[in-house]
């Protein structure tokens, strides 16, 4: 289960989009159903009734907070336990054999988080910027036709900004790049200064050009979160690349405005629109990021290369072990 993204915590959807009507989502190749009962408890279940395999997302949430299958009316609690089978007299022991698979959930930063596994649930490590009240965050998400690793790869790449974002916030860096082309013969051109500090759950990458007074700090938190610290920006953006399947991902932007920012007057849409440049680029690439032994690399690629090494040593390794374990059993 979750072979392409096993045993990780990840946000799935904003809680504002999950109510008492069941919501069908795909996460890392698995079909899930999300819902919230009248007591405010969120749940994530496998979207398949154990009786006849009907999608539970086509059912309804009952008054007592259970999810009812649309086929025969079987009911399931938020923990997946079967609570009712109509027209049958079953004792608790019999009902316990009819549970649907459920997954651990948390509500953090206005999002529903799911652990992509059912055993050995790890602690959820988060940057302090994601521990504010739920209503502090502005959330936007889109489905992109790309592997999730491509979004992390480009988010860690400082030097894509002057080219991919030349018509938006990368214009200044693009001007510098063009001046470099003119001055290259005189050996007077900007040099990227990139330093990497390993952290408990990823890395911090400090980026700047030697001709500019300021730069960008990028924090990567395993597995799929990148936080950008831009000098002078009145907000803190968190990017999540959430795998849907091998061909699609949900790109979620979670914005924490600085105290004092007027949320009604700040143009968040313009900020979100800048990611469309990234979307166009990574949707033109095929599959997951290649291993570090493939392709050509230069010193400024090191942040992306570190992510790729981690991905192949950790996520891909788990994926292979999960597949092998399934085939053996």
Ranges and model annotations:
Residues 1-6:
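A boundary/linker detector
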Residues 11-136, 329:
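Rieske [2Fe-2S] iron-sulfur-binding domain
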């Amino acid at each position: 289960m979750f072979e392409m993204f096993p045993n990780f915590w990840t946000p799935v959807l904003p809680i504002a989009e999950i109510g008492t009507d069941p919501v069908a989502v795909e996460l890392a190749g698995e079909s899930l159903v999300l819902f919230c009962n009248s007591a405010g408890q969120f749940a994530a279940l496998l979207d398949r009734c154990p009786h006849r395999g009907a999608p539970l997302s086509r059912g309804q949430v009952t008054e007592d907070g259970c999810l009812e299958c649309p086929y025969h009316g079987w009911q399931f609690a938020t923990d997946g336990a079967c609570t009712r089978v109509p027209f049958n007299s079953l004792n608790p022991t019999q009902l316990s054999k009819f549970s649907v698979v459920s997954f651990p959930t948390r509500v953090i930063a206005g999002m529903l988080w799911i652990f992509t596994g059912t055993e050995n649930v790890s602690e959820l490590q988060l940057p302090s910027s994601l521990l504010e009240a739920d209503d502090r965050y502005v959330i936007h998400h889109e489905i992109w036709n790309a592997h999730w690793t491509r979004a992390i790869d480009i988010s860690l790449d400082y030097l894509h900004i002057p080219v991919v974002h030349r018509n938006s916030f990368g214009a200044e860096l693009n001007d510098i790049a063009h001046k470099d082309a003119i001055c290259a013969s005189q050996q007077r051109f900007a040099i990227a200064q990139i330093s990497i500090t390993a952290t408990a759950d990823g890395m911090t990458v400090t980026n700047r050009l030697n001709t500019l007074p300021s730069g960008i700090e990028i924090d990567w938190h395993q597995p799929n979160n990148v936080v950008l610290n831009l000098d002078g920006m009145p907000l803190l953006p968190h990017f999540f690349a959430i795998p849907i399947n091998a061909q699609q991902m949900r790109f979620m932007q979670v914005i924490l405005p600085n105290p004092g920012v007027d949320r009604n007057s700040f143009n968040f849409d313009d900020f979100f629109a800048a990611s469309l440049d990234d979307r166009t680029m990574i949707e033109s690439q095929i599959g997951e990021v290649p291993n570090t032994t493939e392709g050509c690399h230069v010193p400024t690629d090191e942040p992306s290369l570190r992510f790729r090494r981690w991905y192949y040593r950790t996520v891909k390794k788990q994926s292979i072990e999960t597949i092998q374990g399934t085939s053996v059993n």
